[in-house]
Amino acid sequence: MIELKHINKIYNGFNALNDISLTIKDGEICGIIGQSGAGKSTLVRCINMLEPPTSGDVIVNGRNMVTLSKRELREERKKIGMIFQHFNLLSSRTVYENVAFPLELSNVPQGEQKERINDILELVGLADYRNKYPAQLSGGQKQRVGIARAIVSNPSVLLSDEATSALDPETVKSILQLLKDINKKLGITIVMITHQMEVVQKICTRMAVMSDGKIVEEGTVKQLFEHPKHTVTRRFVQNVEANQTIEELAESLKKKYPSGKLLRLSFTGNNAEQPTIINAARLVPFEISIVESNISQSSVGPMGVTYIHISGGIDSDYNKFVTYLTDNNVIVEVL
C-alpha cells in the first residue's frame, strides 16, 4: 500500500504540491491525471523519494520513506520500479544487458540474473530480441525494455511517468495491455502518471485528478466518468469524436436545439451495449433523437455517453422515460 499524507513540496517559495493526501491499495492500478504543470510528476517522484517532500509522510509497504536513513532508502527503492516517457537505455548495451543493469548494481549472482532476465524478457515479448541494441528497436520495443528493466528486481510498486505519451496509438494499446498483464500476473501496484484520459480509462480502476499542485477529485474511474464534478475532471471526460469538452458540446447542442429537452446519458458495463434508449422510447409518445454518442472500452468494461433531444410530450411521460433509464443504471443529466 502507498499512503501519501499531507504532502507539500516547495521550490524557491513556489508550492508545487499543496497538502496532498492519497491512498493507493496493494495490487491496484491508479491513474494520476493532470495537465502539464499540475504537479503529477513531482508527486510520483515523492513516492520513491527522488523528490523528497518539504513536509508530509510517504508510506510505502508500511515504511515511512521520509524517515529512512540513506542505506535504508536505497534498499526500499529496490522495491519500486519506474518507467519514463524517454526510455533512457544504454546504447552500447544489448537488450539483455540493459535489463541486467539493476541486477548488476545489486550484485545478484550471474546464475540468478540469467534466470530472472530470461523470464522477464519472455513476459514483455522480447525473448527474440535479447541480443539487439537499442538503435535496432522500435519505440514500443524500447519501452518494453524499460519496463523489463524496471520489474526485473521484483518490485512491489511500478511508477509510470507519462510512459506512453511518446508512442503511436497502436503501440500505446499494446504497452497498456502489457502493464495490465504484469499487474495481473505479478501483483505489482502500478501508479500511472498521464495527461491522457484514454490511458486512465483503458487500464486504471481508480484515479486522482490534479490541478495547480492539488488533488481536486478522486474516485473510481467509473465514478469520475459518470459524475465528473470538478471543472478539470469534466474537461478530461470529453467526447472524443467531437473533440470537445462536455461544456462546449452542451453549449453547441443547446444552440442547435433551442426548444425541447436535452439529456446527457452515461452508460457503463453491460448496459452500455443494451438497447436501453430504444426500450425507454417505446414507453412514451414523444419524439427522441440521438444527437451525439460515443462508446469506448475501459478497465471496467464499455463506457458510453449519449446525448438525446426530446421534442414535445407531457411531464408524466417525460418522468416515465427518465425513471426507466435510471432504473436500468443509466445516469441522466439534464443540460
Segments predicted by a language model, with ranges:
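Helix N-cap at the start of a conserved alpha-helix in ABC-type nucleotide-binding domains
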Residues: 169-171
